UniProtKB/Swiss-Prot annotation:
NCBIfam families: atpD. This is ATP synthase subunit beta 1. It comes from Mycoplasmopsis pulmonis (strain UAB CTIP) (Mycoplasma pulmonis). One of its GO terms (cellular component) is plasma membrane. It is found in: Cell membrane. Belongs to the ATPase alpha/beta chains family. PROSITE patterns: ATPASE_ALPHA_BETA. Produces ATP from ADP in the presence of a proton gradient across the membrane. The catalytic sites are hosted primarily by the beta subunits. GO terms for molecular function: ATP binding; ATP hydrolysis activity; proton-transporting ATP synthase activity, rotational mechanism.
Amino acid sequence: MSQKNVGKIVQILGPVVDISFAGQKIPAIYNNLELVFENNKYNFEVAQHIGDEVVRTISMVSTNGLSRGLEVIDTGAPIMVPVGKEVLSRMFNVLGQTIDNKGEIEAKEFRSIHASAPSYEEQNDSSEILETGIKVIDLLVPYSKGGKIGLFGGAGVGKTVLVQELINNIATQHGGLSVFAGVGERTREGNDLYHEMIASGVLDKTTLVFGQMNEPPGARMRVALTGLTMAEYFRDKFKQDVLLFIDNIFRFTQAGSEVSALLGRMPSAVGYQPTLATEMGQLQERITSTKNGSITSVQAVYVPADDLTDPAPATTFTHLDAKTVLERNIAALGIYPAIDPLASSSRMLDPLIIGNEHYLVALEVQNILQRFKELQDIIAILGIGELSEEDKKLVFRARKIRNFLSQPFTVAEKFSGKKGKFVPLKETIRSFKEILEGKHDNLPEDAFLYVGSIDEAIEKAKGQSNATTANNNNA
């Protein structure tokens, strides 16, 4: 910084702060401005030039205690965050400052959180399957390595637990590096995740970045960019395949909406910011694979009032390769993960990519579940006895498939008391194929609930049968 550009605060409206640079050079849009007051550092990002040498900024920290007249210094650059191997196994805030009480890091390189997306020439498309070990995903909504994956669901249907299971399954199997960006979610969840990563031994290959729901909208709006910047460096310089987990992308949109209102912009549909599509595009287009390496992103997306047509989830939909929809009605049946196999989709569900056997099994499972859904009204009104023999057989088989799509999670062991299962893709295809062929029509429906492979369902049914026989003998 050759010469310090000093301004003065002239207005404070919550997280929006107006700063006058009278007689000085006006800071550029996105520049990071700093203020040190009573041993606390405050950072502001320039959002607008409003005339009369005044800039309107968004504070990255709470503005409590600030007053007009305080001097602010222009750093001459956007927010710069540390990158490189030094950030692994550490926890950061939106500004790249450590928050894990392990002291500061000695990073050799810093990067701006604002960057352009890779050009068309640099990008690289991949059709390689990313095996998750979760039956319903691997069979019906296969994920691609280097793809963008969305987990859509309302409040309390299991998005965060599913993200944590994916971290556990993919990060432990996957040899590359992982970045987790906690955007506007509960601090408790971040703390749980941190300790789970320590326990599972993946922390040394992971970077955590948090801007939780108690923080100002500026921090929540930018924290995803901080995490993405660190992931991009691993991809471009280390030439690594990187996993980027974002929980929750809706909070990024929500924070942008708050900031937009505070900046005085006219709201668009349902009160969202008029720049919603632009902001989402700027973030999502940077999450891509290049010839150097890949970024595979898993993004939890909160769906307000379970309405998938809401502008926030609807705008996110357009950027994704796989859409995994979590349904409250399935959760109400006690089936977890509560993934809707009919509403979810993936571009990878193609016989040229996944092979003919996998494709035909997945298609048949979807067809049976679709027919079962159509028969629900008839069953509710007339009863199952009024169905044809063929439809009765289909309904019983569909219920077994529905139950078999459930799975015990490793990260939920302490809640469920059931040991988590990782099911290889070949085993998943074999198991569902046998159910479709009617080989297990004689097994009770509840034998298919919360098991891994079909062999476990057979063992469970035997155990139930033996227990029933023993009870009858005792009686």
